[in-house]
């Protein structure tokens, strides 16, 4: 009989804010908020330390709301590169316990410690050791969810380890019926707000209710996604802890929320679509791939009454040429846009293949067009993202300069 796996989900408490407090001792006893743009009160709270959360501050809320609840809070601009560096330091610590470490996000990592127990002790002993190492060396408090698979480890961390005194909780096939099944279905790993709403309308309010729901009905309604939801609710997850989670990438995309409502295509929207197309194609070229399916997404400015679309088109041949992708994006957008103000745009390139060879085209100098993109990439990689830039990005609608100062949409 195969030995049951032991999987950890290690999560850093209020990661961005905790890093700032660890590196600035004078902030130790003060509430700290990390916000995307502290100069703009409409900015979003990216992280709030426990002292700020005690005053009612929550992540993803507007900064002005957070400051009303906690006016004494110290508001800091994020340092994304520093957080990435610290995250890598934490990964290095975890890799001393096992070589099976999978970053799930910048502040969460899965570990498979099944084969590590003879060296480092019981799962509880290993979890406590990891907590101590990270606190001593990084100054950040880690919580650990333990389970026989990734799904249960994640649920154990999110719903129990984050709330109990020692920051460690084990969820098993034996105790999940008493511990996990009574939880609201919205607290289950993989269930977002929209899915929660759909499940509630079907009479499913708890994880246990989802576990007991007829599988065939879930599959009929949501296909494979319905099957995965049912499996998770029943504590089933066969996905391994993978050290190469980026292998086999299916698509390359980029999106952004605009700083204001964009209403005019020629003066505003097309500038951002061109910038997004260029970013996607640059990343594709750096990855050595081309794509044959182009998609564009748009979200309207009214968040109370969501509008928008997500449409795609298959090209005649794979490409990573900015102009090819932009032309497809432009046609798609103009076909499906309802003319209303836009607040978010996205461009995606999928059905990827290697760029080693490409279909010869008798009517275009394809090699010349593709080489141009690689030359521009070389200049940017050597001298910076803004070393060479399109004239359209210099207009009021352009976002290229602003994005160049950020990582993942936030300041470096």
Swiss-Prot record:
Cellular component GO terms held in the UniProt record: cytoplasm
Disulphide bridges, residue numbers: none
Site (Substrate discrimination): 16
SUPFAM superfamilies in UniProt: DNA/RNA polymerases, Lesion bypass DNA polymerase (Y-family), little finger domain
Disrupted gene: phenotype observed: No visible phenotype in the absence of DNA damage; in the presence of H(2)O(2) or methyl methanesulfonate (MMS) cells grow poorly on solid medium. A double polY2-rarA deletion is less sensitive to both H(2)O(2) and MMS.
Location in or out of the cell: Cytoplasm
The protein's role, per its UniProt record: Poorly processive, error-prone DNA polymerase involved in untargeted mutagenesis. Copies undamaged DNA at stalled replication forks, which arise in vivo from mismatched or misaligned primer ends. These misaligned primers can be extended by PolIV. Exhibits no 3'-5' exonuclease (proofreading) activity. May be involved in translesion synthesis (TSL), in conjunction with the beta clamp from PolIII.
Protein name: DNA polymerase IV 2
Species per Swiss-Prot/TrEMBL record: Bacillus subtilis (strain 168)
Gene designation per UniProt: dinB2
């Amino acid at each position: 009989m195969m030995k049951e796996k032991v999987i950890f989900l290690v999560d850093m408490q209020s990661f961005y804010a905790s890093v700032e407090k660890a590196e600035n001792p004078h902030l130790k006893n003060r509430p700290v908020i990390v916000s995307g743009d502290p100069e703009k009160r409409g900015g979003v709270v990216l992280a709030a330390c426990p002292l700020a959360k005690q005053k009612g501050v929550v992540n993803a809320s507007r900064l002005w709301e957070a400051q009303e609840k906690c006016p004494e809070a110290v508001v800091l601009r994020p340092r994304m590169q520093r957080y990435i560096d610290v995250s890598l330091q934490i990964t290095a610590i975890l890799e001393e316990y096992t070589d099976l470490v999978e970053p799930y996000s910048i502040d969460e990592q899965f570990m498979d410690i099944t084969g590590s127990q003879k060296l480092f002790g019981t799962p509880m002993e290993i979890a406590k050791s990891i907590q101590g190492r990270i606190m001593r060396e990084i100054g950040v408090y880690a919580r650990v969810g333990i389970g026989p698979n990734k799904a249960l480890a994640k649920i154990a961390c999110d719903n129990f380890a984050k709330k109990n005194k020692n920051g460690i909780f084990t969820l098993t096939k034996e105790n999940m019926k008493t511990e996990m099944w009574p939880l609201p279905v919205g607290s289950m790993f993989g269930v977002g707000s929209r899915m929660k709403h759909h499940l509630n309308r079907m009479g499913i309010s708890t994880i246990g209710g989802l576990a007991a729901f007829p599988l065939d009905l879930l599959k009929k309604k949501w296909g494979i996604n319905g099957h995965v939801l049912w499996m998770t609710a029943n504590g089933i997850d066969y996905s391994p802890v993978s050290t190469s989670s980026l292998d086999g990438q299916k698509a390359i995309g980029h999106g952004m929320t605009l700083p204001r409502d964009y209403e005019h295509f020629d003066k505003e929207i097309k500038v951002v679509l061109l910038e997004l197309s260029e970013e996607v194609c640059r990343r594709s070229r750096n990855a050595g791939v081309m794509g044959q399916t182009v998609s564009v997404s748009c979200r309207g400015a009214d968040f109370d009454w969501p509008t928008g679309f997500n449409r795609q088109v298959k090209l005649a041949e794979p490409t990573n040429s900015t102009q090819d992708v932009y032309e497809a994006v432009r046609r798609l957008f103009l076909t499906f846009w309802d003319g209303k103000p836009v607040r978010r745009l996205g461009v995606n390139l999928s059905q990827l293949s290697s760029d080693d060879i490409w279909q010869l085209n008798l009517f275009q100098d394809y090699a010349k067009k593709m080489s141009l993109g690689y030359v521009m990439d070389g200049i940017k990689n050597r001298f910076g993202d803004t070393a060479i830039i399109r004239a359209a990005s210099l207009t009021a609608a352009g976002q290229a300069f602003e994005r160049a100062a950020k990582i993942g949409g936030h300041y470096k």
